[in-house]
Structure formats: C-alpha cells, structure tokens
Swiss-Prot record:
Residues bound to substrate: G107, A108, D109, R110, T185
UniProt key word Nucleotide-binding: yes
Binding note for cofactor: A monovalent cation. Ammonium or potassium.
Protein name per its UniProtKB record: Type III pantothenate kinase 1
Biological classification of the source: Bacteria, Pseudomonadati, Pseudomonadota, Gammaproteobacteria, Thiotrichales
GO cellular component: cytoplasm
Length: 258
C-alpha cells in the first residue's frame, strides 16, 4: 500500500492507496502535528492505526508539502518509523512543461493537482481551483503546459483576517447564507464572506478564460470547494485531487528510478 501526504499550511491530508483505490483518508490541523521527527512518526503510526490501516502493508510514501520547515522532520519520521525513503513531489519530479513560469515558486500541491487533473482529462485545457488556506487558480493546457494563474486569500483566512483586524467582529461558522442582505452581524459576515468569495471566483475564472482564449474544463478541490457546489463555476469537484496526483507522480518517478 502507498502512503501519501499533502502537508498544507492549515491541514495535513493523509491518504492510503491500495492499488488505485483510496482505502483511508485522514485530515488533521497542521498545528496539531508536532515538529520533531519522533513526534511525527508516533503521530502518523497512531493516526493510521486508529483508522484501521495495516502498517505492515505500507511499502511506499509520497509527499506534497508547502511547509518547508517541516519537510526534514516529516521525511525523517517516514524513514525511521516506516523504514521507507519518502518521495517529495517538486518541479523536478514532473513532466509538466513549466517553462512559462518561475517553476521554483510553484507549490508542490499545485503541481500534484495538475498531474491528477491531466490524468483524468488528458485531452482538455484545464482550470484547477483549489480552495484551501489560499484559493489558487492553475491553468494547464492539453499539451501539459503549465501556465499558473492567481492566488488570493482563502475563505477561512479571509474570515480570520477580518476578525483579527476589527475588534468588534467575532468569528462565525462558514456556511452559505440564505440571504445577501443580512439581519445581524453574523449574517452580514457570512454574506460578505460567501458572496465576496463567489464574486472573486467568477471574475477570476472569467478573466483567466478570456486571457487564455479558449474554453476550459474547471475542476475544484480543497476543503472549501463543497461550499460553492451549488454555484455554476465548476465542471466537477474532486476532493482527493492532490492525493491522487501525489500517487501518480510517485509511480512515474519509481519507473524512472528516482
């Protein structure tokens, strides 16, 4: 079985593949994961056991990380506690054509999502929207040319910034509001948060497609993708897009002996 991990700024998303099938998924706050290799190793083994994963069957590990200061500890934990050399996805481990961008600046999670999207839709121009800590737009052509896109604060990050910057405002649960014109402060915040982000999504998509000059197939992923499932923005929502991209990159690089 293959252990894959998407280490993000807010959450670590862990998946276990048996062949091409995900048999277990676990999500924890990144802040809850201690930073030493021993603490990480114990945490990973415990988390997998609690989800009925047979640790003895794990024979490979692929990682996407946008938290560089945790990479060494995470890699060391996998080596020490699973006796596996982990594979880290990067610009150097993909056959995406990244010549149009500053490739070293592109996050591993964005690379993984593009790899997975291309595998699912090999003959389409694609727009991948990842709604996580940040909301990112990535455009990749049917010829596997990565064109990048845009980045804006994510839904939760926007809410946190609002509440931290305005002393009389407090946090709210993030849900789609029933109305745009709120009747109290909480519904005001929900309305601004939801419809403000929705407007940004629609406008960034419109401008991206206009600049690209051709229709695109739009895939959403990330923790907040489902929040906008009723809106006419995405062609599909793929919650495990990054995990599947890590798996594909791991298998491709194993063939090359990397």
């Amino acid at each position: 079985m293959l252990l894959v991990m998407d280490m993000g700024n807010s959450h670590i998303h862990i998946g276990v593949f048996d062949g091409d099938r995900i048999v277990s998924q676990i999500r924890y706050a990144t802040s809850s994961v201690d930073s030493t290799s021993d603490q990480m190793g114990v945490f990973l083994r415990q988390a997998l056991r609690e989800n009925s994963v047979d640790l003895g069957k794990i024979d490979g590990c692929g990682i996407s990380s946008v938290v560089p200061h945790l990479n060494y500890s995470l890699g060391s934990a996998v080596i020490k506690y699973f006796n596996i050399k982990p594979f880290f996805i990067s610009m150097d481990t993909t056959d995406l054509d990244m010549s149009a961008v500053e490739a070293h600046q592109v996050g591993a999670d964005r690379i993984a999502s593009c790899i997975s999207a291309i595998a699912d839709h090999p003959n389409k121009d694609l727009l991948i929207i990842d709604l996580g800590t940040a909301t990112t737009f990535d455009l990749v052509t049917k010829d596997k040319k990565y064109l990048s896109g845009s980045i804006m604060p994510g839904v939760k990050l926007s809410l946190n910034a609002l509440c931290q910057g305005a002393s009389q405002l407090s946090s709210v649960t993030i849900v789609k509001p029933e109305v745009a014109i709120g009747y109290d402060t909480k519904t005001n915040i929900r309305s601004g948060l939801y419809y403000g982000h929705l407007g940004a999504l629609k406008e960034l998509k419109r401008r991206s497609v206009e600049e690209f000059g051709s229709p695109v197939y739009t895939i959403a992923t990330g923790g907040f993708a489902g929040l906008f499932k009723e809106e006419d923005i995405f062609n599909e929502i793929s919650p495990d897009l990054i995990l599947r991209g890590i798996r594909i990159a791991f298998l491709e690089n194993n063939k090359k002996g990397v």
